[in-house]
Amino acid sequence: MIIVTGTQGFIGRHFLNTLRDKGEDVIEIDQQGAWYFKSNFNKWEEVDLIIHQGAITDTTCTILKALQAWNVEYSIWLCKKAIEYQIPILYASSASVYGKTSDMINPLNYYALSKATIDYWIQDHIDEFKLIQVFRYYNVYGTGEDHKGDQASPVTKFAKQIKETGKLKLFEGSDKFLRDFVC
């Protein structure tokens, strides 16, 4: 059995659909059912993999209690279960933890700080995991992210802008600058 968190989100939903298409036994968890699952799930011995994609991903969120509960505490709880039952885990971090440098973690907003907190926790417990893979996503895009509005990837925003106006404008005077968006 595979646990996938964040199944109402862009990446989690794609994991869920792909695994189901392959006939895998999947337990899907989103914010509506997360605390119920935490209190009631008791089949950890049957879990083969945890794919933890669930989080508040809004980089403009300033509700620290929510970020702490979802992005930090729930992630630590899942990681502890992965350690306790020696379940491999795939964890969604974020390239936003780097801030303005790639040399060290330097988060510039509360979302990035919440992700960096888990990255550090994982680093402190790395030898206890059977297997952990941390993915630091950056500007992920694709079908099904239209609902994200201002939080949609640059590629989605660019495509919409070009479709609507026939032009691409990043910001005032952007025709004089070069930008690299790794997608």
Which residue ranges define each predicted feature?
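NAD(P)H-binding glycine-rich loop region in Rossmannoid oxidoreductase-like domains
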Residues: 40-70, 99-101
